[in-house]
């Protein structure tokens, strides 16, 4: 299969486990590196960012694989305010259509969790992707580690019930 055509691929999604916490951090840092952040900034995030075992156990955290090769992960937090807390693809998987497939899976997971809408605090470089998917910008959130404002988005799942008149 040609990996330049993500829409023709079948991805695998497996539950992350506590043994994957370092891997999650590394994927996030490598993904951020794609967007041109300085090595100093990436190292600062690497030293400050930790995924706790409890986070992985309590939330829906899925590793994304293409032909058994890790290409990213996502995390959904169900709570008083439901969130797509993370969606990161490794640089080799960016721009190949995988994001569209992953976002479909995220919506499926949300339906299973009875989530009808969720919020996303987006990296500015990913905001356009979420807007194309139908998310709406509802504000901004200050990020202390990044010392800047990040877009706050809201995505509402489409109902599976269609009324024909």
Residue ranges with predicted function:
Residues 1-19, 159-165:
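Conserved N-terminal entry element of GNAT/NAT acetyltransferase domains
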Residues 73, 93, 129-130, 135:
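Conserved hydrophobic/aromatic "anchor" residues
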Residues 18-86, 90-92, 103-104, 124:
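Acetyl-CoA-dependent GNAT
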Residues 95-108:
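Conserved acetyl-CoA-binding loop-helix of GNAT-fold acetyltransferases
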Residues 119-121, 131, 136-152:
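Conserved catalytic-core motifs of GNAT/GCN5-like acyltransferases
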Residues 110-123:
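Conserved GNAT acetyl-CoA-binding A-motif
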